[in-house]
């Protein structure tokens, strides 16, 4: 795909190293953005297939938009809806420091979840996540790549789906209309 957008530019010489670096960064950022959106689309398909009620990019406080809000933004904005039945899931191909963004996306939700494909996150970062009440969700086969002390705190995707289903099964159906 990058060839389509950048072939002409690449075949001509760059005016400077800065121009080359700027172009390389644009290409990398486009790739990262596509990978992130692809991950969100795959998760969305999985959630639909599992009959979960959710909304993508629902607006919360200060126009913030978590990747996934269970059950939806309408329930989130309804002060009568039990906050303990709201679930927020961020989706990041890699965490780095961007995991902190998930913490600020929905004030009504105490414990937030982050799905990632990144393996082997450091103990220090896992401790920070735990202390910030953020639970990692990863593919089941990735759990063994994390420090043993934290493996029990990490959910696999199936466990996350079952948790959401359990919460949603006990909610009155009028919330989903």
What are these regions (language model features)?
Residues 41-44, 48, 53-177:
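Catalytic core segments in nucleotide and nucleic-acid processing enzymes
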